[in-house]
Amino acid sequence: FLQNADDYLQILEQGVQYVLEDSKVNKNDVVGIGVDFTSSTIIFLDEQFEPLHRHEDLKTNPHAYVKLWKHHGAQDEANYMIQMSKNKNWLDYYGSSVNSEWMIPKILEVKHEAPEILRRARYIMEAGDYITSILTNSNVRSNCGIGFKGFWDNDAGFNYEFFHSVDPDLPKIVKEKCEAPIISIGESAGRLCKDYQQIWGLSQDVQVSPFIIDAHSGVLGVGAIEAGEFTAVIGTSTCHLMLDSRQVPISSITGSVKNAIIPGLYAYEAGQPAVGDLFEYSKNQAPKHIVDKANEHHMPVLNYLEEL
């Protein structure tokens, strides 16, 4: 599950411009840009902020490409992180879990399988942070992404004690390649840079948000913004999200981060990494006689199975 970051820039330069023109919106009315992205999707960049997969000698190296959220190649690293946290409180607010989809296991996977990528990477960040950084011409991080997927705490910062216990090199890697100004949800990550002002024809006063994890943005979309309200965002995977004024350890959650959805509240996340994908898998495994019957009834396979 790898992607090419150039596709993201093509959408920014062409897709967004098309939407602005097709919607016939008055560009003077555009005052802000919100960014959401599926997480944890990780990108490795050089000193010029260029994705490493653009380097001619790295084009055939899969680890130079964007690691999509559902890349699960770092399971061994995730398991080891859990093992090293036994009898510690490092994962109390992560449900005593580490997911192979998260940033730190993916960094360790690259260290183990493609150390040359790690050596040449100047920046490692969430793809959502990459988009925000491109739009603002700055190197910034969102508290939502780095909090849920990078073991960063609003008060204590990164858990370097935990990182050192996992790998003595890890604190240095994170400090040099991941640390940057962290912007909270609800704040501005900066003004839209001149390049994109010109590309989109927008004002220099347009503000860009820090990126928010895509499922978390759904909480805002349905208006479940009060403490105690619960939202299930169902799709390829499913995220269960809730807000509260307190932070307490809860088993089986996958994180709780302050100010990550609504300022002043802790955002709690749990969920299932495969939901829609499992339905599709089940459909694709249906025997031929089921598929034939569904076709006879002019029904999708899953709908036909539900009626059996």
PLM-predicted stretches and their roles:
Residues F1-R54, D92, R120, K172, ...:
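N-terminal glycine/serine-rich phosphate-binding loop of ATP-dependent small-molecule kinases
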Residues F1-S23, L58-Y94, W102:
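Phosphate-binding loop and its immediate beta->loop->alpha context
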Residues E21-K67, Y94-E101, T132, T136-K149, ...:
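Short beta-strand-loop/turn "lid" adjacent to the catalytic site in phosphate-handling enzymes
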